[in-house]
A protein has these predicted regions:
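DNA major-groove recognition helix of helix-turn-helix/homeodomain DNA-binding modules
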Residues: 50-65
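Short alpha-helical DNA-recognition segment
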Residues: 20-39
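Short, Lys/Arg-enriched C-terminal cap helix and immediately downstream tail that follows
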Residues: 15, 49-50
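Short, charged recognition helix plus adjacent turn
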Residues: 1-6, 39, 67-72
């Protein structure tokens, strides 16, 4: 698994935990499939740019944070 996928999965897991969100609830709130969230968390697929934007907007973080280009 690439470093970006690992960092993304770790950060998404962290953000979901803070918000107490399940995979299905996050998927519903940002308009994607639950299977997409599952694939991201297990490093099977990378999110699209559109999905990254949705996640960044939802969690109020930058896309750079999500993919590990900035620390905080």
């Amino acid at each position: 698994m690439s470093t970006m996928k690992i960092i993304f999965a770790e950060r998404l897991t962290y953000l979901m935990k803070i918000e107490n969100l399940s995979q299905s609830e996050l998927a519903r709130r940002i308009g994607i499939s639950q299977s997409a969230v599952c694939y991201w968390l297990y490093g099977k697929k990378e999110p699209s740019i559109d999905s990254l934007w949705k996640l960044a907007d939802y969690f109020d973080v930058t896309t750079d944070y999500l993919i590990g280009r900035e620390k905080d």
